[in-house]
Amino acid sequence: MRMRKKKNLLPRMEACSSLLVADPRALRGRWRELLPDARELRVELGCGKGRFTAETAAAEPDVLLIAVEKVPDAMVVAMERAQAAGLHNVFFVDGDAACLPEFFAPGEVDRIYINFCDPWPRSNQKKRRLTHGNFLQLYRRVLPLGGEIHFKSDNDKLFEWSLDEIPRFGFRLSQVTRDLHAGSPVGVMTDYEAKFYQQGVTINRCVATMVPWEAPAEAEGEKA
């Protein structure tokens, strides 16, 4: 579903400009200057309208959260949400997952959130999946050993495919569940997730921890 174009997009973006990092490459290796006492730096890939972003940042004020979003009409809503909440530990970047090594130095990111990404269901689209081996190798370039990927999806086929793909690229799976909110809600939800929960849709979730791994000569995720 395409998001409607937001009215007055540019003025709204300018009103939240203090939260937008215009040149993320200039902060590569220096992100913690934005929050010197931060105990962790985390990245959210595709923040959408920012419910998860704002609530996570509010719950953990000593965590520096960088929300990466390529759709301006979504990002402006997320920025307005964060600004209205008076948050000082969250910043926004116009970009996507492929840019992470350009934005962040090796080992600079402690955790990556991937929430309800596009499943790209056709076989010829699999390289676009954010849990594809090509992306996993990019994440390895910015995470330290022990760094984590937190992955949530309502798409069962994508989740099962990802459970097979992720360990092949040097990540250890844990906290695997196919019904995260069984009984009662668990953790911070995204906007979509809250709707899914109300509709009775089950949510899949896992944590992937980076471990030592030696890439094959031509490592590439090729599971269909």
What are these regions (language model features)?
Residues 45, 68:
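Conserved beta-strand/loop positions that form the S-adenosyl-L-methionine
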Residues 131-145:
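A short glycine-rich, Lys/Arg-flanked "PGG" loop and its adjoining helix->strand segment in the class I
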